[in-house]
């Protein structure tokens, strides 16, 4: 079964993409079937200068488990943001300080202070490079490198939805007013521009070893 292209990122466009020495291009592919609960991914770090035989249109697979495993082609306009760990990765003392601080902030936006930090400040929703995983569907779990034991860091988040849970849409990207969906996409959804669906609407995090990116990566659904 041929693997499908999922993302192609150039280091020149994505400041947080820490490419291994001698490479400046990351290509992410996956198998469009669950292994066992989400597509299995493969990472290829390359030098863009060596990529000369370029396909205009990637081949579609003869079969796939779900339509949501065939990404719609998209052009990226990277936007750098600052985010913070999910509240579940913070100490109990810091969680309480954040809860108290969030009360007046949440009141101004008519939001629940219990969820204000996670919705508005901690994790940027959508597809992203680097950053922190959201733990709204499972508890935090250790992510040691299977080769050397180093704590792994998120390389790429593949998300079902681009928008967050706050009504103020604090994480909405800066949009190019002239940008419009391709005329070929009669079902374009700005909240899901890639049309990818992970599980019942979750995220698939790909994490790599910061000490040696060539070590096997791990995958996690949240």
Can you name each region flagged by the protein language model?
Residues 1-222:
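Preference for intrinsically disordered or flexible, low-complexity segments
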């Amino acid at each position: 079964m041929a693997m499908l292209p999922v993302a192609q990122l150039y280091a020149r466009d994505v400041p947080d993409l820490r490419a291994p020495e001698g490479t400046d291009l990351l290509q992410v592919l996956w198998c469009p079937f669950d292994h066992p609960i989400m597509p299995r991914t493969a990472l290829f770090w390359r030098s863009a200068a060596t990529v000369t035989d370029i396909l205009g249109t990637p081949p579609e697979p003869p079969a796939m488990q779900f339509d949501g495993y065939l990404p719609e082609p998209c052009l990226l306009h990277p936007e750098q943001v600052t985010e913070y760990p999910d509240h579940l990765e913070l100490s109990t003392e810091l969680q309480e300080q954040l809860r108290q601080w969030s009360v007046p902030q949440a009141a101004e936006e008519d939001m629940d202070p219990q969820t204000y930090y996670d919705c508005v400040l901690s994790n940027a929703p959508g597809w992203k490079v680097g950053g922190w995983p959201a733990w709204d569907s499972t508890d935090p779990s250790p992510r040691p490198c299977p080769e050397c034991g180093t704590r792994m860091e998120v390389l790429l988040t593949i998300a079902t939805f681009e928008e967050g849970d706050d009504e103020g849409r604090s994480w909405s990207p800066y949009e190019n007013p002239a940008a419009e969906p391709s005329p070929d996409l009669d079902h374009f959804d700005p909240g899901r521009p890639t049309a990818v669906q992970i599980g019942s609407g979750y995220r698939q995090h790909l994490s790599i070893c910061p000490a040696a990116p060539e070590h096997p990566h791990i995958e996690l659904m949240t």
